[in-house]
Curated annotation (Swiss-Prot):
Homodimer. Interacts with its substrate, phosphorylated Spo0F, and its inhibitor, the PhrA pentapeptide. The RapA dimer forms a stable complex with two molecules of phosphorylated Spo0F. The complex is dissociated after dephosphorylation of Spo0F by RapA. Can also use Mg(2+) and Ca(2+), with lower efficiency. The lineage of its organism: Bacteria, Bacillati, Bacillota, Bacilli, Bacillales. One of its GO terms (cellular component) is cytoplasm. Its cofactor is Mn(2+). This is Response regulator aspartate phosphatase A. InterPro entries: Bac_ResReg_Asp_Phosphatase, TPR-like_helical_dom_sf, TPR_rpt.
Length: 378
């Protein structure tokens, strides 16, 4: 009887690299196929603890991809994330070089998904220490894109723009990375909005929407529509903004995307600013319920803020509670935005002394944003 031949770990390593290529391209079916092949081959592989750690890290990255692609509530992703993290962190002392890079980079993605931006940046910065070990251009572009994304959310606008352009230049050379190209266009447009140049953001978003439609990707189409709504709001065209937000909400609802609370929140915010109180109240109730269903603590707070500020009777206690929550989580970009909206509200209602306190809060948040590098030193 012939003994079963042992598979070299180097061969399985190449297969994991192929798996990672499909993950980065968001090719779910191919990624799932190669994942199964890897799992079968590992059973007959020569002993290699580093390779097994690499497999565990890639399984975690696979879950991050699925969490982005799959509609909310279709799986037990949070439980699986916890189990994978526990397994990987139990072997963290063994991680060196490229494995250490992947651990910190993938963990940063996970923290970002949880809206733990400061924690995400900490892991990205740790990954950066081993970036010199990365030789693949696409992997370098992946890192640049993730840095652009996190710096955008922390309102480090010019740094974010630099990373986004760097990533986009690489992705444009590869036809199979259209999803990332679209996402780079989103970040570039968002940075133009933050620079108060929404008219420069518009062509990037129109291109992104066109590419998303050609890809037939509902998530990216809904994101492009949402970002166009945000852009028109910045331009003061509230009716157009409401229309685009509404289209985004429709897709998010039908696909059960996890960014549905965000889309409804922005639509509700615009409706309140249009003085369309009846429709705004309806969307507020709907959005709050959905945010609770999705266990989205941030947007539960933000919906309650809208109701507290724009409802029939101003609830100053709830307004204060929201700012306290945002400060505890160091979400200064949200503080800046909400403080500005509250100040504008009080100015319009002839209460300049109350507006002043919110302008002061806005300026304080801007200072914290400008000092952002200090938040994630390691």
């Amino acid at each position: 009887m012939r003994m079963k031949q042992t598979i070299p770990s180097s061969y399985v390593g190449l297969k994991i690299n192929e798996w990672y290529t499909h993950i980065r391209q968001f090719h779910v079916a191919e990624a799932e196929r190669v994942k199964l092949e890897v799992e079968r081959e590992i059973e007959d592989m020569e002993e290699d603890q580093d390779l097994l750690l690499y497999y565990s890290l890639m399984e975690f990255r696979h879950r991050v991809m699925l969490d982005y692609i799959k509609p909310f509530g279709e799986d037990t992703s949070q439980l699986e994330f916890s189990e994978l993290l526990e397994d990987i962190e139990g072997n963290q002392y063994k991680l060196t070089g490229l494995l250490e890079y992947y651990f910190n980079f993938f963990r940063g993605m996970y923290e970002f998904k949880q809206k733990m931006f400061v924690s995400a940046m900490m892991y990205y910065k740790r990954a950066e220490k081993n970036l010199a070990l990365v030789s693949d251009d696409i992997e370098k572009a992946e890192f640049a894109f993730k840095m652009a994304e996190i710096f955008y959310n922390l309102k480090q606008t010019y740094v974010s723009m630099s990373y986004a352009v760097q990533a986009l230049e690489t992705y444009q050379m590869y036809e199979t990375y259209t999803v990332r190209r679209i996402q780079c266009e989103f970040v570039i447009a968002g940075n133009y909005d933050d620079m108060q140049y929404p008219e420069r953001a518009l062509p990037h978003l129109e291109l992104a929407l066109d590419l998303a439609k050609k890809e037939g990707n509902p998530r990216l189409i809904s994101s492009a529509l949402y970002n166009l709504g945000n852009c028109y709001e910045k331009m003061g065209e509230l009716q157009k903004a409401a229309e685009y937000f509404g289209k985004s909400v429709s897709i998010c609802k039908s696909e059960k995307f996890d960014n549905l609370p965000h889309s409804i929140y922005s639509l509700t915010q615009v409706l309140y600013k249009q003085k369309n109180d009846a429709e705004a109240q309806k969307k507020y109730r709907e959005g709050l319920e959905i945010a609770r269903q999705y266990s989205d603590e941030l947007f539960v707070e933000l919906f309650q803020f809208l109701h507290a500020l724009y409802g029939k009777n101003i609830d100053t206690e709830s307004v204060s509670h929201t700012f306290q929550f945002l400060e505890e989580h160091m979400l200064y970009p949200y503080i800046e935005e909400l403080a500005h909206d509250a100040a504008q509200f009080y100015i319009e209602n002839g209460q300049p002394e109350k507006a002043l306190s919110f302008y002061e809060k806005m300026v304080h948040a801007q200072k914290q944003i400008q000092r952002g590098d200090c938040l994630y030193e390691i």
